[in-house]
Structures are given as structure tokens and as C-alpha cells.
């Protein structure tokens, strides 16, 4: 740590738990689909849907730097950020940078679409078996087939987005010297002296929003 740097807590526990739990659930979803472990696939899908809804709520009501209005900048700002990716400079971000902010939105949108379409999927032609989602029989066959095709297509875009996300993290570490993984593990980041720590929301609020998201998913599936 240099003399003019200080450790600042930038990521709250709810964001960090969301991030790492989501990684495990996405891996579990792919593995369970490939192996045909459908009960497990359903559970992981429900959990992903709940977590994504929670993160959307947290993006409006959660910690200061987790809110969309805090880290979402213009597309032009994101392009300028990417244009400086080869330039080694000092990391001053207390949230996602402009490009990273848009990647968060893209990943959330893809995960939401993937999990929602899976509820109604009837047959995935990309695999060697046939299986329907828990709500597939609640809609007509044409709708189920359309959502099945969407479920398969979004899977490819999701894998691409994840690969780009990991590549960007590696480039920021190796080229720019910015450490992005450890702050998401510990919550703390080494920033220039005088950097302002973001206001972090309470764990009780996070728990309440998580319960709300879970209840919404449960009621939708039961009452659809």
C-alpha cells in the first residue's frame, strides 16, 4: 500500500454474496441441464430468478454505489472507458466503471430472460433429451416452442457475455493494474487518499428485498 492510498469498503455484503452465489448457480444450471438433473435445474433456475430480481431491487433501493443511477453512465462514456483500456492508470472507481456498469445490465437482462423463458420451455433441440419447464403446460404449444427457442438462443449470448466479462477483468488486472476480484471478495479496495466511501445500505433491507423477490417468484409460479 502506498503512502497516499487507503483501503475503503466499497462493496456491501449483499452485493458480494449475490455475485458469488450467482456464479455457482449459473454453473449448476448448465451442469444440471447437460446431465438431465431436472429437479436440480428447476431449483437453480428459481434461485437465479430470485437473485436477479433482488439485484434489480437493490439497484434502486440498496447501497449508494450499487444503484443503477450511480454507476450507469452514457454509452459514449462506456466507449471512452474501453478506449483507455490499454492505458495504465490509477483506479479511482468506488463502483462499476462506465463499461462495467453496462455489462452488469446486459448480464442481468440475459439471466432474467434465460430464467423466465426456461419456466415455459417444452423441448430444447440443442440437447439429446426432451423435457418441459414447470409452466410449459400452462401456455399453448406455439408459445412454449417460441420460449424454448429463446431459452436456447439466450444461452449462447449469456456464455459470450460471461466470457467477455472475465476477459475484461483479466485485462484490467494485467494491463491497467486494476484489481477487481479481491474487492468483490473482501468488500475493500485500495484507492487514493481522500476517496469518499459510498453509503452502504443495511443487511436488514437486503434480507427484506430478498424475501420480497423470493415471494414474487413463488407466487408467480404457483398462481400463473
Question: Residues of each region from the PLM?
Answer:
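Membrane-embedded alpha-helical bundles that constitute the cytochrome b-like, heme-associated redox core
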Residues: 1-224
